[in-house]
């Protein structure tokens, strides 16, 4: 364990994307977090974009969806992504941002529009981040789907999605190639609720030194 990351979340996710005053508070908070991470010798943020409470990136759960289109929300959220990244880089220009989920989760169900995805608007926020990020910024798609992975083929397929397929899902493909890396999260006591966590017989755990 050589690197430290400060965890930051999007919860509770109740802030209105179009509320400038509220977003001023959000940006101030992340600016403070960036200073703490930098001065604390952290590599950067572990940015958990999972919607544990409200659907911050879900168009169907936006309070102004009856008066503003998906594209209008996308444009505003892209702006917020730029503002967020600029504020963070102001205090931490060489930050590494680990994302629990990247562009893949923003994709729509097959045959449907991105507006129907529960994380559809996340892609716009990430686009804004890429547009504004400093040359030294690294963004890592840490691919939470990999928590239970054991097989190399699973990692290979995920790597291809992050490094090749996801380039097609951003409006900033060149900056994506320059700034985005692949990284896989592993949940060491994965499935402990189902199989428990055995300290005497490691072979009974999802992950074992034998596998």
Model-assigned labels for residue ranges:
Residues 1-211:
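Glycan-processing catalytic domains of CAZymes
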């Amino acid at each position: 364990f050589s690197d430290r990351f400060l965890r930051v979340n999007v919860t509770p996710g109740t802030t209105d994307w179009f509320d400038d005053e509220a977003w001023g508070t959000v940006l101030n908070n992340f600016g403070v977090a960036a200073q703490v991470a930098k001065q604390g010798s952290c590599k950067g943020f572990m940015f958990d974009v999972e919607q544990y409470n409200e659907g911050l990136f879900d168009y169907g759960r936006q309070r102004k969806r009856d008066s503003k289109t998906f594209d209008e929300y996308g444009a505003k959220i892209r702006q917020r992504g730029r503002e967020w990244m600029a504020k963070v880089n102001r205090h931490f220009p060489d930050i590494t941002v680990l994302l629990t989920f990247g562009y893949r989760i923003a994709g729509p169900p097959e045959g449907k529009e991105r507006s129907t995805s529960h994380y559809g608007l996340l892609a716009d926020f990430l686009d804004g981040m890429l547009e504004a990020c400093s040359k030294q910024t690294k963004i890592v798609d840490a691919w939470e789907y990999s928590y239970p992975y054991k097989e190399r083929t699973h990692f290979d397929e995920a790597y291809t999605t992050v490094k090749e397929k996801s380039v097609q899902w951003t409006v900033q493909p060149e900056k994506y190639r320059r700034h985005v890396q692949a990284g896989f999260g592993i949940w060491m006591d994965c499935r402990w609720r189902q199989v428990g966590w055995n300290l005497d017989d490691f072979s009974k755990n999802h992950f074992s030194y034998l596998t």
